Regions:
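Bacterial N-terminal signal peptides that target proteins for export
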Residues: 1-5
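Hydrophobic helical h-region of N-terminal Sec-dependent signal peptides
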Residues: 6-10
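N-terminal signal peptide c-region/cleavage motif recognized by signal peptidases
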Residues: 13-15
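Residues within mature, well-folded domains
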Residues: 17-102
Length: 102
């Protein structure tokens, strides 16, 4: 009974659903975490939104130096109601998250 009520409550909700993945298909091409921003843009085209979120201070113990790494978020979609959120740190793709909006 509890499971039925929980499923009924979820079915009626207008929440945003999301999940993370390490690859994204753009047409016949794939992009993966670790790819460079220009490679993603070549394969997927211009995002519908592109925003600089800020910078993050990193420290390289090998070279004993710190540097600021630029953090960006690109959004692609909607594709069948799904938006793809791509996060770049220092020009490298570090996270791909898909979100469906109801």
């Amino acid at each position: 009974m509890l499971i039925t009520l929980t499923l009924a409550a979820l079915a009626g909700s207008t929440a945003t659903f999301s999940y993370a993945t390490s690859t994204l298909r753009c047409g016949s091409q794939l992009v993966s975490t670790g790819d460079r921003a220009f490679e993603v843009q070549q394969k997927c085209g211009e995002p519908v939104s592109q925003e600089v979120l800020g910078t993050q201070e990193t420290f390289n113990s090998t070279y004993r130096r710190s540097e600021a790494v630029r953090i960006e978020e690109w959004i692609y979609g909607p594709d069948n109601g799904m938006y793809q959120y791509l996060r770049f740190e220092g020009g490298r793709l570090v996270r791909i998250e898909s979100k469906r909006r109801n």
